[in-house]
Regions:
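Pore- and gate-forming transmembrane helices of large, multi-pass membrane proteins
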Residues: 346-349, 388, 427, 439-474, ...
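Hydrophobic alpha-helical segments
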Residues: 1-21, 394-508, 904-905, 920
Length: 982
């Protein structure tokens, strides 16, 4: 009974509640409910329509900032900031694999076209049969001649470790060929046995007597130690004999006497090079991996063979009796790799310095130290966070997007960071300054700031983007990538600024007092307004001098070494190699001529193509190229001159055996040359071929062809295909040139091209592909020629589209033209600045003009926008320029200070670029502050008006005074100097 009572007491109140709910629901008018629900979407839409875009940006301040930071952090690993580098090499935190896809090859600057004789397509023709990926091991011997057996043995050890699978085309070890004094000595030393085998191989092919060939091969294999094998000889006398038979041009390519620390000559060869051809297809390995592995192998051999550690004077610790030998990896491939892998590592080392500099400058300008002499620490820190954090995020996001998209870039893209960092802070400052001027609640002040400043910031961003986009019209892809990256960076900065700055400002509740403009700026502006004609004449004179005189003195010069980080040992040694060996810019003459020789005997062996005649044409062209200043040429002919025909063979009397065998007379003649050293002596293949060529009968021609067949087959495949294509229809003449200025490079290349063209009209005519030198020098010259065209193209686009954009925004073409004049002046001044500093037009400095358009137009826009708002009178001009002067000074100082961090990047080409940019930034600010008011004042005083159309007609008719007075009355508040917060 108790339990039942409890249940009844509980259900009674519940029933009462349910009854009341039913009664209430029954009294609800369903039509009213439906009407209310149907109005909800309309109310939401009306609320959004009533809300300004500025208030929407600040609806959720904390979430907006947090989402922006989260987005930045998600892209951070792709920006390269976590790449391993000096001081940050813990594999737990950093990545050995570069985040950005950087290509340091100069060839990427070449445009792609359909012209078969364009530089890029000619290089592709060479790459069908040969590799253009080359490494050079620079050998320095301080105690011994590099051709002494003990040093040759060390070079041989390095070669055998690096090229452990010879004649494999790089399939197993990624090395196609090795060329050095060691390989030539080994090639010549082992040629005897291969000559004999090649002779009997040709004999078997010509006569069908394969049994005799097999018997002789067994004899040769048994006497390999006596005849010579592919190794460094045991006797120095044999090495010296081989060297004496080598042509001088071949020796100059492989060994040099560069003197000592105190003497010009050492009277011995104390430098050598090992030239290594790398396969184009290296599988999973990158060129960087191969470079690292090769240097590691060299270091290991050095440690185990007591090379010692030569100091700067070439001295070694004699206690351990070292060889005092050093080998350093350099050459085009390591140089390209240094640009590829080291550039961004170096950038991230100096970028924090730039961040600190920009933050410090922001703090100094906004802590009231300059305005009142007192420091408002909290205020300064708030401005640093508000203006600096979005820009820092924008830099990381920009580089992160480049890395995420795997967009191929070049070394020049490292300029994106400092430029975006320096420019980006100004957008945030414009908003915070106007926020500080406004009254009301934080949201009301921000709405007012965005409504008044948002248009100017958007216009600044648009014109800056246009300036940077103009770089994409250059014919060189790397400059296009810089343009896209900078333009994309400004887009990111704009969105980050519009999202983060308003919300950070509200969250931090920034409060800044307003200050009147400094008297210096008021006085400076009064001069061009008062003496507008004199100011215009002065600026015009300086511009004419720069564009007319200084422009002619600025030379175009491409120097790949200056675009590489000079702290890398491979780069330093490349400069030494270039100087001491007069090499470093490898090039090729691709000769299209049939030099094939068959062992066939009889009249059928004499074909229309005369292989020796073509070889003579190659030898003549090689000799003429060697006579050209700053050029060293070698071809297959140098090996023909270095390898002797005669062979020492003991045991079976091979020559007697041949005499007893019925063979055609040409075969017996060749046999006498090879096996009768008493008759042939120590004569080279080339000498014998030349002697046979003097014979007018067909027998001499048959012997010549048979001997050529023997020579080709006596070479190792690796050495033969270094010079000759597998089908014997194409051969290379290797041309080496030192790194020089473009004028000297062009002069040398032009002379070589003349000889290449004349080779088709010589006594022994041969065809050179394109009649031109192919390789690094030709790329340098072609890119240099493209620089000037790309500069004018990008400048024309930048200025043209900037004017169009301003005309659309201001709705007046005349006002747009007048506003752009200071930018044109700044661009014209680049030649005076570059000429004064001895700066050449390079792959980096060529971008200065377009970057200045993007940066400099900002200065003019802020003044022009304020002048237009205030009515375009003389007072409006004075007020606008004076109140904007301090902002220009701040923007210029912060931008220049931020760019100075790039001085810390050890790449020589960047230093003059940064210097010129900083100087021209100052000129851009001065031209906006002085030239622009002079132009406006002149137009107003001349009654020409600042704008066209109906406004100009009113002014020209003398009806302006009432309008001007009305405009001044309507804009009294903006004209008050105290309203500019800076």
């Amino acid at each position: 009974m108790a339990k039942k009572g409890t249940g009844e007491s509980f259900t009674a109140p519940v029933s009462a509640i349910v009854d009341r709910a039913r009664t209430g629901i029954s009294n609800v008018d369903s039509d009213v409910v439906r009407g209310t629900i149907s109005k909800i979407p309309n109310r939401i839409r009306r609320r959004f329509r009533e809300s300004e875009s500025s208030s929407l940006l600040t609806l959720f301040p904390i979430w907006a900032v947090l989402l922006s930071l989260a987005f930045t952090l998600s892209l951070l690993p792709h920006s390269g900031v976590l790449d391993c580098r000096d001081g940050f090499d813990n594999p737990s935190f950093c990545s050995d694999e570069p985040a950005l896809n950087v290509n340091g090859d100069l060839e990427v600057y070449l445009p792609t076209d359909d012209d078969p004789h364009s530089v890029k397509n000619l290089i592709a023709q060479v790459e069908k049969d040969w590799t253009t990926n080359v490494m050079v091991i620079y050998v320095e011997s301080y105690n011994y001649n590099v051709t002494q057996i003990n040093i040759l043995d060390q070079i041989d050890k390095v070669e055998r470790v690096i090229n452990n699978q010879t004649n494999d085309g790089g399939a197993d070890d990624n090395v196609i060929y090795v060329l050095s004094i060691s390989t030539v000595v080994k090639e010549v030393n082992s040629s005897g046995g291969r000559v004999v085998k090649a002779f009997f191989s040709g004999l078997a092919e010509a006569t069908g007597n394969q049994q005799l060939s097999d018997e002789i091969n067994e004899t040769i294999d048994a006497q390999s130690d006596l005849i010579g094998n592919y190794a460094i000889p045991d006797e120095q006398q044999r090495v010296d004999q081989i060297l004496q038979e080598m042509p001088q041009n071949a020796l100059d390519k492989l060994v040099r006497d560069v003197g000592t620390a105190t003497e010009d000559r050492a009277f011995r060869w104390n430098r050598a090079v090992i030239i290594i051809g790398i396969a184009d297809d290296t599988g999973d390995k990158t060129v960087g991996d191969i470079v690292s592995e090769t240097q590691g192998k060299i270091d290991e051999i050095a440690a185990t063979n007591n090379w010692g550690a030569p100091d700067a004077q070439g001295k070694c610790d004699e206690d351990s009796n070292p060889l005092c030998l050093r080998m350093t990896l350099t050459g085009p491939a390591p140089l390209t790799n240094a640009v590829t892998e080291e550039s961004f590592k170096l950038f991230w080392q100096v970028f924090p310095v730039g961040v600190i500099i920009v933050a410090s400058m922001l703090f100094i300008f906004h802590c009231d130290l300059l305005q009142t002499g007192r420091i408002r620490f909290v205020q300064g820190v708030k401005v640093v966070i508000i203006a600096g954090l979005p820009t820092l995020c924008a830099v990381w996001v920009t580089l992160g997007l480049i890395g995420l998209l795997d967009y191929e870039v070049t070394m020049t893209v490292i300029l994106v960071g400092p430029i975006v960092l320096s420019l980006g802070v100004s957008y945030g400052l414009h908003i915070t300054n106007r926020y500080a001027e406004s009254k009301g609640t934080p949201h009301e002040k921000m709405a007012a700031a965005l409504n008044s400043t948002g248009r100017a910031v958007f216009l600044s961003a648009m014109t800056t983007i246009i300036g940077f986009i103009s770089l994409t019209f250059a014919p060189m892809k790397p400059i296009q990538t810089v343009g896209w990256a900078l333009a994309g960076g400004i887009v990111v900065v704009y969105f980050m600024t519009m999202i983060m700055v308003p919300n950070l400002t509200i969250l931090l509740d920034l409060k800044k007092p307003s200050h009147p403009p400094h008297k210096v700026f008021v006085a400076a502006v009064n001069m061009p307004v008062k003496w507008s004609k004199i100011t215009l004449a002065l600026f015009l004179t300086v511009m004419i001098i720069s564009a007319g005189y200084n422009r002619q003195n600025v030379e175009e010069n491409i120097d790949l070494l200056k675009m590489a980080p000079n702290e890398v040992e491979a780069v330093q040694k490349m400069d030494v190699y270039s100087t001491e060996f007069e090499a470093g810019q490898p090039g090729f003459l691709l000769v299209e001529a049939d030099i094939r020789a068959d062992p066939e005997l009889g009249i059928g062996s004499i074909t229309a193509d005369h292989p020796y005649a073509n070889l003579e044409g190659i030898e003549n062209l090689e000799a003429k190229c060697n006579d050209v200043e700053n050029a060293t040429a070698v071809s297959i002919v140098f090996l023909m001159k270095a390898i002797a025909v005669g062979v020492n063979v003991s045991g079976s009397p091979i020559n007697d055996l041949i005499e007893d065998t019925p063979l055609p007379d040409p075969i017996k003649e060749v046999a006498e040359l090879i096996f009768d050293r008493g008759q042939a002596g120590n004569v080279s293949f080339w000498t014998i071929l030349d002697t046979l060529d003097a014979q007018e009968d067909d027998g001499g021609r048959q012997v010549q062809n048979f001997l050529l067949y023997v020579f080709y087959n006596s070479m190792t495949e690796e050495m033969r295909e270094l010079f000759i294509s597998p089908d014997y229809q194409r051969t290379l003449i290797y041309i080496d040139m030192p790194f020089m200025d473009v004028k000297s490079t062009a002069a040398t290349a032009e002379q070589i091209n003349l000889w290449a063209k004349s080779a088709g009209d010589s006594e022994n005519p041969i065809s050179v592909l394109g009649d031109t030198l192919i390789g690094v020098a030709s790329i340098t010259i072609e890119v240099n020629n493209l620089i000037v065209d790309s500069q004018w193209t990008s400048l024309a686009f930048a200025l043209g589209f900037t004017i169009v954009t301003l005309a659309l925004v201001f709705r007046d073409i005349r006002y747009a033209l007048l506003t752009t004049v200071p930018v044109g002046f700044t661009v014209a001044m680049q030649w005076m600045v570059m000429d004064s500093g001895g700066v050449t037009l390079s792959l980096v400095t060529v971008m200065i003009g377009s970057i200045l358009v993007g940066v400099g137009i900002d200065f003019s826009i802020h003044i022009a926008n304020r002048v237009k708002e205030l009515g375009g009178t003389l007072d409006a001009i004075r007020s606008s320029c004076a109140s904007t002067g301090m902002s220009l000074f701040e923007a210029t100082t912060v931008t220049a200070a931020g760019l100075t961090c790039a001085y810390g990047i050890p790449i020589e080409a960047i230093t003059p670029f940064v210097t010129v940019i900083i100087i021209l930034l100052i000129i851009a600010a001065l031209s906006a502050l002085l030239l622009l008011p002079a132009i406006y004042s002149f137009m107003v005083k001349s009654n020409l008006g600042l704008t066209g159309g109906a406004t100009a007609m009113v002014k020209s008719s003398g009806l302006t005074q009432a309008l001007i007075k009305r405009d001044i009355d309507a804009t009294d508040s903006p004209l008050d100097y105290s309203n500019d917060a800076w």
